[in-house]
Amino acid sequence: GLVHDLSKYSWTEFSVGAKYYQGTRSPNDAERESKGYSSAWLHHKGRNKHHLEYWVDYSVDRNCVELVGMRMPEKYVVEMFCDRVAASKNYNGDKYTDSFPLEYYLRGRSRHHLHPESADLLEDMLTTLAEKGEDYTFDYIRREILHNK
């Protein structure tokens, strides 16, 4: 929506984007390589609910002291899906295919703290995109997930 990634216009994030921009990957990765962490990413993930890292917290199970993924509202999983597709198009340019976002997700899935239900929904959308294309997938999301909201 209109406020998607609005925090990127804050100085904390914008200055990193300007300094480390390469066009083929996130400037946050370059900052992380340079400084050992990404100040822009730490700022960004705490303000944008479509990032799975926003939903990481300590487990409600008192016997578990690990950080786990909390269940994300569906609208934010859909926004995360759209964000991943856009990033994949941006970083891959003319080489982009509708299978790229799923392939990227699957390569990094073991590192994610994503609630199982949120992961299932994201994987469903990414798989639908890879198998049936963008037009079908966005129609499917509107009809079946967002219920024409």
What kind of region is each of these model predictions?
Residues 1-149:
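Metal-dependent phosphohydrolase cores
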